[in-house]
């Protein structure tokens, strides 16, 4: 797997291209997920994303695929700019922090309505990020003091079904756990009939990867 951040880099002739767009609340873990996948390094400090584009090459069924991955800003200040990056999206990753019930609720309340408006018929994958923090006792206790709990795997599955996603995946960028699987699944969904026909399958079963 190779990665580049040069905006002008395009797929070589004969290589399929897939545009992946990550959306979700600011700080939910989508940027760390992308950086670990593309560069192999976890960012120890948080810097809010404006908009970033990465190019990554991988294999799908033995054939090269060129991923154009867009990381979008989740802050309200960028609501008018974000839709500029949706055209021609092949697959959407709706990301949330499993230790942030608010970011989880926003998948249904904010992000799904937005992408459904601007990207009709584009397949969706819901991604639960920061799974390593489910075992952070300090964070869990803080949530419990406010009457909250980390988002469970089962609730993530239910959310994916509720927005008609083709898959639900969980990952930990810090532990490099399941990171590659997220983007491998995105590429495979974008290139398969599973992705092309997903809007007809909202009430049917979907793939779950942990």
Swiss-Prot record:
It is a lipid-anchor. The modification Cysteine methyl ester is found at residue 207. Heart, placenta, liver, skeletal muscle, and pancreas and, with weaker intensity, in several other tissues. It is found in: Cell membrane; Early endosome. Its main location: membrane. GO terms for molecular function: GTP binding; GTPase activity; guanyl-nucleotide exchange factor activity; protein kinase binding. It holds the Pfam family Ras. A motif (Effector region) lies at residues 46-54. A lipid is attached at residue 207 (S-geranylgeranyl cysteine). Residues 208-210 form a propeptide. Keywords: Cell membrane, Endosome, GTP-binding, Lipoprotein, Membrane, Methylation, Nucleotide-binding, Prenylation. One of its GO terms (cellular component) is mitochondrial outer membrane. It comes from the Eukaryota. Belongs to the small GTPase superfamily. Rho family. Involved in endosome dynamics. May coordinate membrane transport with the function of the cytoskeleton. Involved in the internalization and trafficking of activated tyrosine kinase receptors such as PDGFRB. Participates in the reorganization of actin cytoskeleton; the function seems to involve WHAMM and includes regulation of filopodia formation and actin filament bundling. Can modulate the effect of DAPK3 in reorganization of actin cytoskeleton and focal adhesion dissolution. PANTHER family: RHO FAMILY GTPASE (PTHR24072). Interacts (in GTP-bound form) with DIAPH2 isoform 3, DAPK3, FILIP1 and WHAMM. Interacts with PAK5. Interacts (independent of GTP-loaded status) with ANKFY1. This is Rho-related GTP-binding protein RhoD. The gene is RHOD.
